[in-house]
């Protein structure tokens, strides 16, 4: 549903435009009077002598000043950063035709325009020097460094003109860059695009992960967060890369068009650009559909696993392809930007997309459309302030939309870090040396930090999100605001829920926002537990190297595990796939990306092996392990005890406890025959024999395969989550998770399952 761009719940009185014109005439008269009393050889303008405060002027008439919706306290940036007067350039703008008419009138009067867009809030640019005590109280104190020098004033008219030219120059550069990109990667009649390759299955699955987690396809960053590293464009552009760059460039051009006094005829060129984008999206959708049809018709060759055909982006319906859905959403947002340029009407989502594009252009180092080096620091500050205004208004307007709270919380923290860096206010200084920071600067930093903390707290309470980046940002805001109890909870949560606790703890240890808590007893205890894990990891690496040497010398057989007792494994496998739905057994695991399936289905992963599929299955498993940055911890022998070997390695760091693990599991099974699942079934109902004791006796024998029940028993006895990445062909059920009724151990047991007959032990890549 489309909304107007006016996010202020008041009617804008039309007399304000007239008031602005009256003020302009009054200023011209005063300027003439001042020039008569000054030396004619060194005239100074009236605007140059005014002290810009950013507040709404008090008029001498009966007109009511422009009122904003209620906002929390916000220190005025003008006393700190000497902003350029472009605040509120996205709200209540006149239609483009009226803007151009006003610009022509100003040019006829041989005067530079007093405002970029003729809109009500910009009347602050024509305000006179406040004379009343009340007006002086509205002006926040200024820092010593930024006190205006009345003897050498900076003429604001020149600033406005320079700012307009700056945006125009940036637009021209981005347009030239966009044209070159289109020529090199799209080509005439889309020839180059048609010849570009499709992303392979691994790349498509990576894209899908990013889309599911609301990440940028190329930078992998959340909206309104700062990227820690400089982004590097791909060496070879796939069709997906080309479309994303084309859409991002088009959005950047439309944003700059809105910020500059561009000729309306320039908008005609946008139509051709948008048509080209839509054509490429439709072409990609057709190619995906062809790949899907080929797969359904079983026409794929042995290289299928390296093709898009094997990716989860393909579904049974063309319109359900997640990449195409994403690109179509991007295209609709671009259409809104085009309408915004022409009519100033835009929806809440469109406005957020506008500000998100602008934020990326200013902060995305290495981003293809990066303009951060083209704008002055003061202008950048004002743009950031305007982004804040838009996001805040969106939150106030759409109170039920939690995603806007996350956006505002992330932006406020990012802006806090930018101001910190520019003013050399370290986090340690912010927390412990408050008296040494100028009062207005400290209030300004505190405002954005507090607002970030508040918005993220509200959002996490309303709709929790399984994104560790959000958790860490919120934890850091709690640290900087000395909310120690909350900081402790979220730091511990961030570390414990990480796949690799050691790496997560290293991130915490190196973060300056948390450094002042390093001496706290709870923090010391956390890091001690991590040090123990580090030592175990070193020992595991040493044992792994020794074992590899021994295995190379012994040249052990790589034959598969023997058949499980009974002659009906395949029938059992099919039956369990159909019937074993353990509702509620598996809770949503916040330990992995959203794409990792928090499955409520435990499958018996032991059908009869089919040798012709082994090679494809191995390649499929390797791609999945690489995608989630995992590797085999040790080479597990294929002697029928592979599941027990893998569990032994995960629990004790070596394979020497395999028999002990088997005995422990079987003992638990004997004692818990009637263990009830959440759906009311008992585990003894899921064996291939009516005699539970016979099943346990067979499972206790060396060389017999472990199954789904032994995994369940291991999870319950050891109190640990078990995560399994399988080589099964299904792209929706390859990640299986078993969560015990009571978690006693924070360590997650990571297993692989290869070619339907062999288990492996996994560890993170290092």
From Swiss-Prot:
The active site is at residues 639, 642, 758. Residues 550-561 have a biased composition (Low complexity). Residues 129-159, 537-566 are annotated as: Disordered. It comes from Dictyostelium discoideum. GO terms for biological process: proteolysis. PROSITE patterns: OTU (PS50802). Keywords: Hydrolase, Protease, Thiol protease. The keyword Hydrolase applies. Pfam families: OTU. SUPFAM superfamilies: Cysteine proteinases. InterPro entries: OTU_dom (IPR003323), Papain-like_cys_pep_sf (IPR038765), Peptidase_C85-like (IPR050704). This is OTU domain-containing protein DDB_G0284757.
């Amino acid at each position: 549903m489309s909304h107007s761009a006016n996010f202020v719940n008041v009617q804008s009185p039309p007399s304000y435009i007239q008031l602005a014109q009256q003020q302009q005439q009054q200023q011209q008269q005063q300027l003439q009077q001042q020039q008569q009393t000054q030396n004619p050889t060194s005239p100074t303008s009236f605007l140059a002598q005014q002290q810009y405060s950013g507040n709404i002027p008090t008029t001498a008439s009966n007109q009511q000043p422009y009122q904003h919706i209620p906002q929390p306290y916000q220190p005025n940036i003008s006393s700190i950063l000497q902003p350029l007067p472009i605040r509120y350039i996205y709200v209540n703008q006149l239609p483009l035709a009226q803007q151009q008419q006003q610009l022509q009138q100003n040019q006829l009067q041989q005067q530079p325009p007093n405002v970029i867009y003729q809109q009500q809030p910009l009347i602050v640019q024509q305000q006179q020097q406040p004379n009343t005590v009340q007006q002086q109280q509205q002006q926040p104190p200024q820092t010593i460094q930024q006190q205006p020098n009345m003897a050498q004033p900076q003429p604001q008219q020149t600033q406005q003109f320079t700012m307009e030219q700056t945006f125009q120059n940036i637009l021209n550069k981005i347009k030239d860059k966009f044209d070159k990109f289109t020529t090199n990667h799209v080509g005439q009649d889309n020839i180059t695009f048609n010849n570009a390759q499709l992303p392979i299955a691994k790349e498509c699955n990576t894209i899908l992960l990013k889309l599911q987690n609301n990440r940028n396809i190329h930078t992998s960053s959340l909206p309104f967060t700062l990227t820690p590293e400089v982004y590097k464009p791909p060496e070879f552009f796939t069709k997906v890369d080309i479309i994303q760059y084309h859409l991002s460039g088009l959005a950047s051009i439309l944003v700059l068009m809105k910020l500059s006094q561009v000729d309306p005829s320039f908008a005609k060129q946008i139509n051709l650009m948008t048509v080209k984008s839509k054509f490429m999206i439709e072409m990609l959708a057709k190619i995906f559909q062809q790949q899907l049809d080929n797969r359904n018709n079983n026409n794929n060759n042995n290289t299928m696993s390296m093709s898009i055909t094997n990716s989860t982006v393909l579904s049974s319906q063309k319109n359900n392809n997640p990449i195409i859905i994403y690109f179509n959403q991007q295209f609709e947002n671009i259409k809104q930007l085009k309408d915004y340029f022409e009519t100033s009407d835009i929806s809440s989502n469109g406005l957020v997309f506008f500000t998100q594009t602008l934020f990326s252009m200013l902060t995305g180092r290495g981003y293809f459309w990066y303009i951060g080096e083209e704008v002055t620091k003061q202008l950048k500050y004002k743009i950031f302030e305007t982004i804040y205004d838009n996001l805040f208004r969106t939150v106030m307007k759409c109170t039920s939309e939690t995603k806007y709270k996350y956006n505002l919380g992330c932006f406020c923290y990012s802006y806090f870090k930018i101001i910190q860096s520019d003013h050399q206010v370290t986090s340690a200084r912010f927390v412990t040396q408050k008296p040494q920071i100028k009062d207005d600067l400290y209030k300004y930093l505190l405002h954005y930090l507090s607002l970030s903390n508040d918005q993220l707290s509200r959002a996490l309470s309303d709709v929790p999100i399984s994104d560790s980046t959000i958790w860490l940002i919120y934890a850091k805001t709690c640290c900087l605001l000395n909310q120690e109890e909350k900081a402790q909870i979220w730091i511990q949560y961030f570390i414990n829920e990480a796949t690799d606790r050691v790496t997560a703890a290293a991130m915490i240890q190196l973060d300056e926002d948390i450094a002042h808590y390093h001496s706290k007893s709870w923090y010391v205890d956390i890091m001690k537990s991590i040090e123990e894990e580090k030592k175990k990891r070193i020992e595991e690496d040493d044992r792994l190297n020794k074992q590899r040497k021994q295995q190379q010398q012994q040249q052990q057989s790589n034959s598969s595990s023997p058949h499980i007792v009974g002659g009906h494994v395949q029938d059992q496998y099919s039956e369990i796939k159909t019937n074993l739905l353990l509702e509620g057994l598996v809770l949503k695991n916040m330990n992995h990306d959203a794409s990792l399936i928090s499955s409520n289905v435990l499958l018996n992963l032991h059908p009869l092996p089919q040798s012709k599929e082994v090679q494809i299955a191995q390649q499929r498993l390797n791609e999945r392990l690489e995608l989630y940055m995992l590797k085999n911890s040790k080479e597990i022998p294929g002697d029928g005890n592979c599941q027990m070997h893998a569990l032994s390695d995960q629990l004790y760091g070596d394979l020497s406890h395999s028999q002990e693990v088997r005995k422990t599991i079987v003992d638990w099974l004997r004692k818990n025959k009637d263990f009830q699942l959440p759906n009311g079934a008992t585990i003894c109902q899921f064996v291939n024999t009516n005699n539970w004791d016979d099943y346990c006796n067979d499972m206790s024998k060396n060389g017999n395969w472990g199954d789904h029940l032994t995994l369940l028993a291991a999870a319950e006895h050891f109190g640990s989550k078990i995560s399994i990445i399988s080589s099964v062909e299904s792209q929706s059920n390859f990640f299986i998770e078993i969560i015990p009724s009571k978690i006693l151990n924070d360590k997650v047991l990571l297993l692989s399952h290869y070619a339907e007959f062999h288990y492996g032990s996994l560890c993170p890549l290092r």
